[in-house]
UniProtKB/Swiss-Prot annotation:
Active site annotation, chain numbering: 179
PROSITE patterns for the chain: DHHC
Top-level EC class: transferase
PANTHER family reported in the protein's UniProt record: PROTEIN S-ACYLTRANSFERASE 7-RELATED, ZINC FINGER DHHC DOMAIN CONTAINING PROTEIN
Pfam family, one: DHHC
Record PTM Phosphoserine, positions in chain: 327, 377, 406
Keyword Calcium among UniProt keywords: no
Domain of life: Eukaryota
Organism for this UniProt entry: Arabidopsis thaliana (Mouse-ear cress)
Gene coding for it: PAT07
Name of the protein: Probable protein S-acyltransferase 7
Enzyme Commission (EC) number: 2.3.1.225
Length: 443
């Protein structure tokens, strides 16, 4: 009889253990052993950094450096210093937005227990109504009924204001949107940094735009020339003015839009998906309280410890039946018998070839080791013959109980198991070292 050894506890440093980020089922990309979590489109982050750093570098070299001599004392140096510090601050906010957990809800290993029956309650005598999870549940929030949906991927009911991101393949709390420019979902834990990043980028564009015009004005005053001629003397300023003007429309418009969302306590997803007014939005707490909730509330800790150790899932060992060993294909056939489905005999060919000839019909698909087991009893032979004469198509029947929550063997399988046990007791002296495996299908 093959006995599966009990699982052994392993230390955190054993080779059989992995960290959570190594077994993560989402589409996220991790850096520094799970300390930074990014979205699958993290490469776009490099483009965003270049769009910020390159214009500021051009500004410091060709514009701000020449303004140092035009301002007395330390005012000229401060122009360069402010631009550099502002850029570093902006990039830090970008990293805080892109490299942290946005509020991912850990997915369940198994679906929750079904609570209602789905299907016809007046099922036949040999059938049991199937248990199925309801797709939508209703919850109350501030006196308003919300419908929460079941997520098949994460196997959980998404709480209010939570949505599943198809890009990151995660359910995110207070999901706002997935931003390709930062390569990350925007949710409960990084929305504050996202808005600060967009707002600071807008201010940086205004800063560069303004001092480029200051430099052009200085050229006009020193050389007593027109605006167009002064602009031709500093092509870098012309490029930066055009670039920052276009950028201000994008990031500035995004800043104004999110100021509206914060004042009404909405998310981008809710604004496009639903239409709240001031009376029907259950999340609106007033302009002042909405801003306090966004910028001065405590950021909840992450629900995921990406650096925690998890044990590697061991492979399933072969199971034993009546003193012998059973291959995985044979186990699959037995599982299908227990579930009321037709056994897939074709998949058992390799396992049966070691014990007998696979060319015979279903009546002779019995595993006998070295011919030590005697002829089968008439009862078992009649049962096998009866099953083999049935047509190939059978309705699938589930033995899942209505309330028990467990799989039970059908009476036909129990009766057959009892007959096999009696046969083994009668022939135990001559077949102690052999294994008998017989396959049957419930009627």
């Amino acid at each position: 009889m093959y006995v599966v050894p009990p699982p052994q506890r392993s230390d955190s440093g054993s080779n059989g253990d992995l960290r959570v980020y190594q077994t993560w089922k989402g589409s996220n990309i991790f850096f520094l052993q799970g300390r930074f979590v990014f979205g699958p489109d993290v490469r776009s982050l490099a483009l965003t950094i270049c769009l910020i750093a390159v214009p500021v570098t051009i500004f410091c070299i060709f514009v701000a450096r020449k303004l140092i001599d035009d301002f007395s004392d330390s005012w000229g140096v401060s122009i360069v210093a402010v631009a550099v510090v502002f850029t570093i601050y902006d990039l830090i906010l970008l990293l805080l937005t892109s490299g942290r957990d946005p509020g991912i809800i850990p997915r369940n290993a198994h679906p929750p227990e079904p609570e209602t029956l789905d299907g016809n309650m007046d099922a036949g005598a040999g059938q049991t109504p199937q248990l199925r999870l309801p797709r939508i549940k209703e919850v109350q929030l501030n006196g308003i009924t919300f419908k929460v949906k079941y997520c098949d991927t994460c196997m959980l009911y998404r709480p209010p204001r939570c949505s599943h991101c198809s890009i990151c393949n995660n359910c995110v709390e207070r999901f706002d949107h997935h931003c390709p420019w930062v390569g990350q979902c925007i949710g409960m834990r990084n929305y504050r940094f996202f808005f600060m990043f967009v707002f600071s980028t807008t201010l940086l564009c205004i800063y560069v735009f303004a001092f480029c015009w200051v430099y052009i004005r200085k050229i006009m005053e020193s050389e007593h020339t027109t605006t167009w001629k002064a602009m031709l003397k500093t092509p870098a300023s012309i490029v930066l003015i055009i670039y920052t003007f276009i950028s201000m429309w994008f990031v500035g418009g995004l800043t104004v839009f999110h100021l509206y969302l914060i004042s009404t306590n909405q998310t981008t997803y809710e604004n496009f998906r639903y239409r709240y007014d001031r009376r029907s939005n259950p999340h609106n707490k007033g302009v002042v309280n909405n801003f306090k909730e966004t910028f001065f509330s405590t950021i909840p800790p992450s629900k995921n410890d990406f650096r925690a150790m998890v044990q590697r899932e061991p492979p399933l060992p072969p199971r034993s039946v009546a003193g012998g060993f059973m291959s995985p294909n044979m186990g699959k056939a037995n599982d299908e018998i227990e579930m009321g489905r037709k056994a897939v005999w074709a998949d058992m060919g390799p396992a049966m070839s070691d014990h007998g000839d696979g060319k015979h019909g279903n009546n002779e698909r019995l595993h006998v080791k070295d011919g030590e087991l005697g002829e089968l009893s008439p009862d078992i032979r009649a049962t096998v013959d009866e099953q083999s004469d049935r047509p190939s198509m059978h309705p699938r029947r589930s033995s899942w109980g209505r309330k028990s929550g467990s799989w039970d063997m059908s009476p036909e399988v129990m009766a057959l198991a009892a007959r096999v046990g009696e046969q083994n007791q009668n022939g135990g002296g001559s077949s102690s070292g052999s294994g008998l495996v017989t396959e049957n299908r419930p009627t």
